[in-house]
């Protein structure tokens, strides 16, 4: 009985921790979206509009913008009652040695990444300034986010796959640009190659996906 009780307690503890991570990511998503549509987000919004995206599409995918300051998101989440450890555990910030906690994403167009329950679990960020490192980065991996086990837009594409096969494309903007033109059955990996876990997800949803030649090399 003691073992059963311990297992139950561990399950409850893990469930509560994961729910907190999901809630933090949802709060971050709202913050990024609000910031994109503020006066400070005009350059990023123009970038997305110049890429041909409609305002409706931008809102549908909950695209956002991270501030250029190093603690914009941190301060917002703290004001909602989350502490620094919570924010770091959610993969949204990191702490350099002997320095304060800093936002992981700075001055980036933000792409929310959702699980099959349609909950935001992480973000991809596209840099608007080359001085902020790599062109694209993702949230750090967490208890609710493993980069090689998810696909961008899978939940939405799953609905369309009843009539059309899944189409695997390269990245976030490819998926969103297709959706902007009423093609809703596209998904994208969260890195440069498809993993076996991602392929299993694809085949679970669609028996005959359209797989580009560039993705026929799989990561072991």
Where are these regions (language model features)?
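Conserved short loop/turn motifs at secondary-structure junctions
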Residues: 13, 33-37, 61-66, 215
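Short, well-structured beta-strand/strand-turn elements
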Residues: 51-64, 182-192
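Phosphate-handling DNA/RNA-contact segment within nucleic-acid enzymes
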Residues: 1, 13-20, 24-28, 69-209
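Structured loop/turn residues at secondary-structure junctions
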Residues: 191, 214-215
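Non-catalytic interaction/clamp surfaces of large macromolecular machines
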Residues: 16-18, 23-59
């Amino acid at each position: 009985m003691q073992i059963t009780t311990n297992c139950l307690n561990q399950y409850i503890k893990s469930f509560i921790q994961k729910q907190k991570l999901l809630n933090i990511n949802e709060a971050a998503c709202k913050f990024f979206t609000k910031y994109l549509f503020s006066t400070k987000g005009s350059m990023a919004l123009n970038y997305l509009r110049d890429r041909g995206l409609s305002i409706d599409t931008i809102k549908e995918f909950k695209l956002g913008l991270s501030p250029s300051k190093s603690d914009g998101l941190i301060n917002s989440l703290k004001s909602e009652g989350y502490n620094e450890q919570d924010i770091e555990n959610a993969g949204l910030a990191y702490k350099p040695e002997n320095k304060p906690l800093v936002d992981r994403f700075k001055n980036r167009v933000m792409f929310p990444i959702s699980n099959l329950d349609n909950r935001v679990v992480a973000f991809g960020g596209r840099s608007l300034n080359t001085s902020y490192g790599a062109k694209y980065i993702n949230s750090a991996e967490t208890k609710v986010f493993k980069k090689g086990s998810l696909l961008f837009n899978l939940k939405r594409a799953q609905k369309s796959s009843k009539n059309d096969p899944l189409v695997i494309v390269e990245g976030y903007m490819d998926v969103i640009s297709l959706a902007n033109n009423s093609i809703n059955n596209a998904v994208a990996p969260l890195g440069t190659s498809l993993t076996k876990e991602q392929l299993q997800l694809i085949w679970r949803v669609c028996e005959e996906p359209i797989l580009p030649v560039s993705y026929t090399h799989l990561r072991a």
